[in-house]
Amino acid sequence: MDEGSAGFTMTSIALSEAVDKAAAPFESVAVSRGKRLSTSIASGVRAHADAAAVAQVVELLLDNATRYASEGSVIELSLRAASRGQGKGAAELVVSNAVDELPEGDLDRLFDRFYRADVSRSSKTGGSGVGLSVVRAIAEAHGGSASVCGHGNQITFTVRF
């Protein structure tokens, strides 16, 4: 165990189990918000990470998705082992969903602290615009990254640990 960036306690964790546990409550949240959560979590994925921080990333991404995904849509969460190159292990967490309106020119700004693609949404959906900036900060503190891409009406967030 070692003390990582930003005070995280980094240990070897069963990432598959941590992601599954953090995602489980969002199945009912998604249903209550008129959506459905579908998960594809590879078994046996491990990472050198802070378990509480990983759970926070999953919770922030799924809270965001359940708030902003199109009514009746499926939110897809997946976790798989990946490679950072030179044999160094990594994991990739992906959350993807349909949205009513994709903020085309604003995608890169979604990770900016306090940024909101549509300021009128705060009164409808809540939130303060900090969640995705926290996701990126946690990913980077773990030596990884967080990115977003959009195609058509589909938005996909990818976090690498």
Predicted segment positions?
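Short helix-loop "hinge" at the ATP-lid/N-box region of the Bergerat-fold HATPase_c
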Residues: 65-66
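Conserved catalytic submotifs in the C-terminal HATPase_c
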Residues: 9-14, 31, 36-46, 82
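Short alpha-helical Gxxx[C/S/T] motif in the catalytic ATP-binding
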Residues: 131, 135
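Short beta-strand/loop element within the Bergerat-fold HATPase_c
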Residues: 72-89
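A residue-level detector for a conserved hydrophobic packing site
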Residues: 54-55
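Conserved glycine-rich
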Residues: 35, 143-144
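Short conserved segment of the HATPase_c
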Residues: 102-116
